[in-house]
């Protein structure tokens, strides 16, 4: 694994623990264990609870294993997609869990590590895969999909409402794209200079988000898992989801609202405190929603 020195700061830890309410002898399923920050905080807070942590990224899992090695008797980590969590639990002989945590953000390692292709800040191969065993890369998507399909992806997944077609056209004109800076160049050429100046965030943020979501099937996977999540929880068990853009948040909100087996604990999404945002600016866009499995309703 590459040398990596960036410190990962998990988002909204206090709120996660407050809503999950981990207790001794209870099992928490961390669906996006990442570098292990939330899991470590939960295990420190609750000396008798157990964590089952999963992630598709084998590189961040190795970081999590190191971070959680002092809790090896209470933390079990697995490389698997959360959409297959029900299969994993069955394999482990775990019928139900008492808490589910999902932190849908890109990890610090994925952003700051080398050659993952998630960042527009430096030149890297156009990869963007969270699961390095997947065959679909950003480079393949950007160089092979038709212009119309690229425009749809950028419009829907990047919420790039005005300039999606122009960006898609420039991507096609600039083919082949091989690095992250090739994609930045195409977006820069597509946007009017006044639009670049007007944007509060980097002008390529929306396009990078769109391609990343498509490469990793993020929204499809989230929908598929949330449909099953309520049946993985014991009565009184809780699910906590932290999302970082409106597409994810909308899916979580609607799934919770439409469920007959969940009681919503957060009528509106909980946002990070101003103090946390000062200490960790990446927390700014975080939105936390929580729900509790009720006794009745479809069993």
From Swiss-Prot:
InterPro entries xref list: RsmH, SAM-dep_MeTrfase_MraW_recog, SAM-dependent_MTases_sf
CDD domains per the UniProt record, alphabetical: AdoMet_MTases
Any one annotated GO CC term: cytoplasm
EC primary class: transferase
Keyword Transcription regulation recorded: no
Role noted for this protein: Specifically methylates the N4 position of cytidine in position 1402 (C1402) of 16S rRNA.
Protein name: Ribosomal RNA small subunit methyltransferase H
């Amino acid at each position: 694994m590459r040398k990596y020195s960036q410190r990962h700061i998990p988002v909204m830890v206090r709120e996660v623990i407050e809503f999950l309410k981990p207790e001794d002898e209870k099992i928490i399923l961390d669906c996006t264990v990442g570098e292990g920050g939330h899991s470590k905080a939960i295990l420190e807070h609750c000396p008798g609870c157990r964590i089952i942590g999963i992630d598709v990224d084998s590189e961040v899992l190795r970081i999590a294993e190191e971070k959680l090695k002092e809790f090896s008797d209470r933390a079990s980590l697995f490389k698997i997609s959360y959409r297959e969590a029900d299969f994993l639990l069955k394999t482990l002989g775990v019928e139900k869990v008492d808490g589910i945590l999902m932190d849908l953000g890109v990890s610090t390692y994925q952003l700051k590590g080398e050659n993952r292709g998630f960042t527009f800040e430096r030149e890297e191969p156009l990869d963007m895969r969270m699961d390095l065993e997947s065959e679909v890369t950003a480079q393949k998507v950007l160089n092979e999909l038709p212009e119309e399909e690229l425009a749809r992806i950028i419009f829907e997944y990047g919420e790039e409402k005005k300039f999606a077609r122009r960006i898609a056209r420039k991507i096609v004109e600039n083919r082949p794209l091989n690095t992250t800076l090739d994609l930045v160049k195409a977006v820069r050429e597509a946007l009017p200079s006044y639009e670049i100046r007007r944007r509060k965030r980097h002008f390529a943020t929306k396009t990078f988000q769109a391609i990343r979501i498509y490469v990793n099937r993020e929204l499809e996977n989230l929908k598929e898992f949330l449909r099953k999540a309520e049946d993985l929880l014991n009565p009184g068990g809780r699910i906590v989801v932290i999302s970082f853009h409106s597409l994810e948040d909308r899916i979580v909100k609607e799934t919770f609202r439409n469920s007959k087996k969940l009681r919503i604990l957060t009528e509106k999404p909980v946002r990070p405190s101003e103090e946390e945002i000062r200490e960790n600016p990446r927390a700014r866009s975080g939105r936390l929603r929580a729900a509790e499995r009720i006794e009745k309703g479809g069993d």
